[in-house]
Amino acid sequence: MKVSQNWLKNLVEISSTPVDLSEKLSIGGFEVESLEDCSKNVNGVVLGKVLSVLKHDGSDKLSICQVDIGTSKNLQIICGARNIKPNVYVYVATVGAKLNAVDLTIKRSEIRGVMSEGMICSLQELGLEDSSEGIEIIDEDLALKHELGTPVSDLLQLNDFIYDLAITANRPDGMSVIGIAREISALLESKLSFPELNHKYNIHLNKGIKLCPEAITSNCIYTISCIDGVNGNKLSPIWLKDRIEKSGIKSINLLVDLTNYILLEQGQPLHAFDKEKLSNLIGKDVSPEDFSVRKAKDNESLVCLDGKKYELNENITVVTCSDKPVAIAGVIGGLETSVSNTTSSIYLEGAVFNPVTIRKSSKAVGIRTESSSRYEKGISSKNTISAVTRAMNLLEEYFSINLPIINTSNLKNNEDIFIKLRRSRIHKILGPLIINDQFEKRNISDTEIVDKLTLIGCSLKSKEYGWDVAVIPNRSQDLIREIDLIEEIARLIGYDRFDLNLPNPIKPGKLSSEQLALRKVKNGFTENGFNEVLSYSLVPEDKETLIKISNPLLLETSCLRDNIWKEHLEIVNRNIKAGQNSCYIFEIGNVFHKNTEFIQKEVLNGAIFGNKRFEKWVNSNKDNDLNYYQARGKLKEALSSLNIKIDDKPTDSIDFLHPGRTAKLIIEGKDAGYFGEIHPKLILEKKSLKIVYLFSINVDNLLGASTRKNKWIPIFKQYPIVPKIERDINFVFSKKFLISDITSLIKKTGKNLLEDVYLIDIFEDIKLGEDYISYTFRLSYRAQDKTLLDSDIKTIHSSIISNIEKSFQTKLRN
C-alpha cells in the first residue's frame, strides 16, 4: 500500500519527520518497506521561460536558447529538442543539479564551440515518465501562478514523501488511507480530520437483486446506483491525479479515478458500468433488478478491462446484467460495459463479497488486483454505503448529476457490538509499567487505557469490572476478543515500557502421561526397525462419504481422508519398485468420517513387508517374507513397552484384508483396530505388488489402557535368584481354535509355577490334513524360593497336557 505524506497531512496532524514516522509505523505493526523522497530527482530544477531560440552554426539539430530563470542574468542553454520555441515555459536543470533518472550531473560545458549553462528537461529526464517526445512545455496557466526560478518540486507538488507499507492479512484497515491516518493519529496522539459527507441519499432495500449465497453471505452487502449527468471525457483535477498516481494507480479519467480514489481513501472497491453499454448488451433499458451475482457457467467467457478474454467456470463468481456476465466479481470489470470518454450515465456498484469466493475467482483467472487484494483480507460491510455516499458527493462536485438512489441487498445493522474488557485481565496479562528507569513500577491507569482505545476509534462504557468496548467498523475484522484489545493497549503504549518480568511466571512444563505413552509407542516402533511416515491428509473426492473442505486449492486435495492404509500401500509399492526387500512403516494421524456429524479420530496405522532379519543376505535362497504370526509378533514387540494386553479375534468383515488372515484387535474388551494380510484381490489388481500386512489401532483406546495407574506406574518385581525349567510341547490342532484360547488355558492350569508360555513354532503339512496345524509351545516354570526339580513340575505339566487334549480334541506329539 503506497500513500503520500501530503495526502495523510490532509487527514491527520503529523509532527514527526518522515524517517521517524516510518520507524513508528514499523514498530506499531505497519512495516514501511521503503520511503521515497519525491523531490530527489528534481533538486536543482526550476521554472524557466525561453526568450529566444537561434540555430547552432555547427549543427542542424541543435539550438542556442536564452532562458530566464528569474536571476539577474539569463542562461544560455544548448538544446536539441525539436519542439523548442520562444516564449514557452520549461523545466530547467541548473548547473550542479543531478538528474537521478538518467544518472547525469549538470555542468557548464562547451558544445561545438558554444557554452551551455544548464539543460532544458523532458519528463523522462525528471523521472516522471517512462518515455518522452522532446522537452516538456509547461501549461501557461500553471506557470503564471509561480515566479520564474520556482523549484519544480513546488510546481509539481513533489515536496512529498511516499510510504510503501507492507500490510499484513490481520490488519485490513491498513489498506485504506483513512485507516493509516487513524494509526498515525494513535501513534502520535494527534488530531484527525476526516472528510464529512455533505449530502446523504435515499437508500432502497431492493429484494429483486438476485445474489449467490456463497458470494454474498450474511456479513456481506451488494449495492447498485444509477447516476445520470456524468461526462467520461472529463479529466481529473491535479490534486486527485497526484494522489492516486503517487499510490501507484494510473490516472484515466475523472469517473474511473474517483472510484480508485474511494478504493484508496476508504478501502472500499467500487466499479462503474456504462449505462448505455449495458442497455445495448441486454437489448433494453437497465434497472437495478437486472443485476445479479452468481457462479459462472462452463463455456461462458468475458473480455475484461485488460483486453484479455477469460474462459469462465463454476469456481469464478460473476456480476451479471440480465444474466449476461459484465464483471468478475471483486476482481476486474468487463471491457464491453466499461466507462469511456462517451459515457454520460453510469451504474455504480459498491459491494462486499465473501473473501473465499474472491480468492477462488482471482486464482482461477490468474489476476490479482487492488480490489481483490482488499476483498481477500476482509472488508466491513458497515462502511460500504458511506463509501458509496462519499463517491457520490465527489461526483456532485464535478458533475451536474441527478439525486441517485442507493439500491442495497440488505440494510446493515449499525448497532455497536460490545467486547467485555476487564481491568484485572489487563493488569494480569501486561504487568506493571516501568517508571523512572526501573526504580518505580505501577499498573496502567484507567485514563491511559481509555485514551489509547479512543485513539483507534473505540467507544467505551464504564462498568464495575472495566469497560464494554465498541469497535469501529474498519477494525471489526481484527478486534473481536478481549485479548485483541489488550494487545492494542500494549502496542500503543509501547512494549518496551512494560516490566521485563512476566506477570505470570511460566512453570516448567512436563509431558502428560498420554504424551509420554505416545513417545513410548514411537520409540518402540523405531527400535524394532520401523520408519515413521507422514502422509497427506487431503485426498480427491472418490466417494460421496468423504468430507469436503470449503476452499480446496486443487481437486486432488478437496476432501479429508477417511483412511491411511491406501497411502501406506502406495509407500510400500514405491519401495518395492525401488528394489527394497523390506518396508516397515508406521504413522500416527487423523482420519475423518461423517454420519450425523463429523467425527475426527486419531489412529496408529502401519504396514509390514519383507523380513529385515536377513538384511543383505537376500540371495541366500531363504524365504524373505514374514508369515502372519511373525508379522503380528513385530507389532506385539513394538507395543511391548506399554505393558498392555492386546487380544486377537479373527474376522472376515474387512474387505481389503485376507478373510482368513485378519484379526480384530481387542483392548480391555473393546474393539480397537485390526491386523491382517492384504486381500489377494488387491495383488491381482496390482494395487499391492507383494504380500503386505496392515494394522490400525485407535490411539484413544491404546493410551487409555496404557496410562491407567496399574499399567503406568512401575511396580517393583524382584529379579529371580533361582533358575527356570523350560519344557516344549507340540500338538496338532484344528485351525478353528485360536492360539490365544490355547495359551489362556495353559496359563490358567499352570498358574502356581508357570512363569510364561510362548508359541515358538508353527508347522503345516498335507499329511496333517488341510484343516489342521501344528503348534509348538515353550513353557517356563520357576519358583520364588527354590530351584525346581522335574518331580516338582511333573503334576502341573501333566495337567496342562491333559487339559489341552480334552479341551481341543488333540494328542501330544512325540
From Swiss-Prot:
An example molecular function term from Gene Ontology annotations: tRNA binding
Coiled coil: none
Broad class of enzyme this protein falls into: ligase
InterPro entries on file: aa-tRNA-synth_II/BPL/LPL (IPR045864), B3/B4_tRNA-bd (IPR005146), DNA-bd_dom_put_sf (IPR009061), Fdx_antiC-bd (IPR005121), Fdx_antiC-bd_sf (IPR036690), NA-bd_OB-fold (IPR012340), Phe-tRNA-ligase_IIc_bsu (IPR045060), Phe-tRNA-ligase_IIc_bsu_bact (IPR004532)
Keyword check for ATP-binding: yes
Listed GO CC annotations: phenylalanine-tRNA ligase complex
Domain FDX-ACB: 720-813
Domain spans labelled tRNA-binding: 39-153
Principal location class: cytoplasm
Cofactor stoichiometry and binding remark: Binds 2 magnesium ions per tetramer.
Alphabetical UniProt keywords: Aminoacyl-tRNA synthetase, ATP-binding, Cytoplasm, Ligase, Magnesium, Metal-binding, Nucleotide-binding, Protein biosynthesis, RNA-binding, tRNA-binding
Record-linked HAMAP family: Phe_tRNA_synth_beta1
Quaternary data: Tetramer of two alpha and two beta subunits.
UniProt name for this protein: Phenylalanine--tRNA ligase beta subunit
Source organism of the structure: Prochlorococcus marinus (strain MIT 9312)
Gene: pheT
